[in-house]
């Protein structure tokens, strides 16, 4: 089970990625520093679960990499958005 901080960050990331967004802009939008530790803790697991997709999946660190929510991510967002 996700702890509250991670769950809150997951929700925020899913909301912010409804359109393609660069990592720096994504982390700024959710008040996190654009640091590799935050990528590893919050973004990479969502990619691995298939909830977020990468514009350049063959290169995780592509200089123009952008992220967007996937259909399974949208379904999860709908589930966790309900009161």
Task: Kindly give the residue locations of the regions a language model identified.
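C-terminal regulatory or interaction extensions
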Residues: 1-83
């Amino acid at each position: 089970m996700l702890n509250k901080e991670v769950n809150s960050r997951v929700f925020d990331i899913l909301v912010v990625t409804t359109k393609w967004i660069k990592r720096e802009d994504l982390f700024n939008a959710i008040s996190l520093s654009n640091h590799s530790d935050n990528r590893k803790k919050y973004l990479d697991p969502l990619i691995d679960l298939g909830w977020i997709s990468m514009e350049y999946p063959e290169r995780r660190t592509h200089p123009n990499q952008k992220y967007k929510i996937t259909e399974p991510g949208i379904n999860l967002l709908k589930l966790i958005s309900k009161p």
